């Protein structure tokens, strides 16, 4: 009887002084474990008579319950203390200035490409893609380039060591190659644009060895220059968001179109005319090369440089700046990730 009281006081003294849950668990094992103090007292029941065993067993069970309650109460206190400590350690000091969030931005070429694509999508144009590495047929022959055309020369075109049909492969010099592939693999009518990288051996303030083009093709029955002029005029005014912009279609020559024209624009009457794109009716020889009957279908094509349009719209003077990676320049000419272009809300930020 006296031993039970001593055990209870010992348990109370030890448990009340515990500072963490790990130590509390150790005391739980010490008193209530398989080889614990209370368990040791229970083993004494075998040496008692029936009446003594009944009385002593009742007292031991009460002792066990009291110690369990003491441990439970202490555990709740320690858990609350640990939670409060963790919350205090994780507390945010609202008086500390926030760190500047380093957010990326959209490159002007990407933004301009998206704006151009968005405008053409209003006309119902879809997007076609093709490989950057091309063969001679798709890049030149199918587009009605003569064998001695200057564009085929080494100083204008990047040729590769790999060959196809005894002719070297090359980096495409325009995305007109996509038009050839699409016409070969499909059937008219067509209405699509082909955005992508193109490559030419040239480098100065207005030329880089790699640049971005968007070329377009419309083909159906009874297509004429009037349709071409309407699409180009509406596109230019929409992209530059200027209904008063002036355009002129100047006669020109391209192997793959006949008649051909270059389009010049000026924002105001006192400005100089600026060349922005080339266009024309698809040459009958091109249609023949892709298996389309030119007596039944006609079409027009156009091509523009994305960098050229970006320079005009964003007032960028040197084409090479697009690719130099100057962080100061990129921070100045940048667009937010959510500046999604649309005609209804205005195309630019």
From Swiss-Prot:
Q: Which residues bind Mg(2+)?
A: 258
Q: Has UniProt tagged this entry with the keyword Manganese?
A: no
Keywords in alphabetical order? Aminoacyl-tRNA synthetase, ATP-binding, Cytoplasm, Ligase, Magnesium, Metal-binding, Nucleotide-binding, Protein biosynthesis
Instruction: List locations, semicolon-separated.
Output: Cytoplasm
Instruction: List the PROSITE patterns hit by this protein, alphabetically.
Output: AA_TRNA_LIGASE_II (PS50862)
Q: Name one GO molecular function term.
A: phenylalanine-tRNA ligase activity
Identify which cofactors the protein needs according to its UniProt entry.
Answer: Mg(2+)
For this protein, what does the record note about how its cofactor is bound?
A: Binds 2 magnesium ions per tetramer.
Predominant location: cytoplasm
Q: Gene3D superfamilies annotated for this entry? A: Bira Bifunctional Protein, Domain 2
A cellular component term from Gene Ontology for this protein is: cytoplasm
Top-level lineage group: Bacteria
- Known catalytic reactions: tRNA(Phe) + L-phenylalanine + ATP = L-phenylalanyl-tRNA(Phe) + AMP + diphosphate + H(+)
Q: Which GO terms describe its biological process?
A: phenylalanyl-tRNA aminoacylation
Q: What is its EC number?
A: 6.1.1.20
Transmembrane ranges, per UniProt, are: none
Family the entry assigns: Belongs to the class-II aminoacyl-tRNA synthetase family. Phe-tRNA synthetase alpha subunit type 1 subfamily.
Its protein name is Phenylalanine--tRNA ligase alpha subunit
**What is the organism field in this record?**
Rickettsia rickettsii (strain Sheila Smith)
């Amino acid at each position: 009887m006296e031993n039970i009281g001593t055990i209870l006081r010992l348990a109370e003294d030890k448990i009340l002084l515990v500072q963490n849950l790990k130590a509390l668990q150790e005391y739980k094992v010490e008193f209530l474990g398989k080889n614990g103090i209370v368990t040791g007292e229970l083993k004494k029941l075998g040496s008692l008579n029936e009446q003594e065993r009944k009385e002593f067993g009742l007292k031991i069970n009460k002792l066990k319950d009291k110690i369990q309650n003491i441990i439970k109460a202490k555990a709740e206190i320690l858990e609350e203390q640990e939670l409060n400590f963790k919350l205090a350690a994780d507390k945010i000091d609202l008086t500390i200035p926030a760190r500047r969030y380093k957010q990326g931005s959209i490159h002007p070429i990407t933004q301009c490409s998206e704006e151009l694509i968005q405008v053409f999508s209003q006309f119902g144009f879809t997007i076609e893609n093709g490989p950057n590495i091309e063969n001679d047929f798709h890049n030149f022959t199918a587009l009605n380039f003569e064998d001695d055309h200057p564009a085929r020369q080494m100083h204008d075109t990047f040729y590769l060591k790999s060959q196809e049909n005894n002719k070297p492969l090359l980096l495409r010099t325009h995305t007109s190659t996509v038009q050839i592939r699409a016409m070969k693999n499909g059937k008219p009518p067509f209405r699509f644009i082909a955005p992508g990288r193109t490559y030419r051996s040239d480098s100065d303030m207005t030329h880089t060895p790699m640049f971005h083009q968007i070329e377009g093709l419309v083909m159906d029955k009874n297509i004429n220059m009037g349709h071409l002029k309407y699409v180009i005029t509406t596109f230019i005014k929409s992209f530059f968001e200027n209904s008063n912009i002036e355009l002129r279609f100047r006669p020109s020559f391209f192997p793959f179109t006949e008649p051909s024209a270059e389009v010049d624009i000026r924002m105001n009457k006192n400005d100089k005319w600026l060349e922005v794109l080339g266009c024309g009716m698809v040459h009958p020889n091109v249609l023949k090369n892709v298996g389309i009957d030119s007596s039944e279908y006609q079409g027009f094509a156009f091509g523009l440089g994305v960098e050229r349009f970006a320079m005009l719209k964003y007032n960028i003077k040197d084409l090479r700046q697009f690719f130099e990676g100057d962080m100061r320049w990129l921070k100045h000419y940048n667009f937010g990730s959510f500046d999604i272009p649309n005609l209804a809300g205005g195309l630019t930020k």
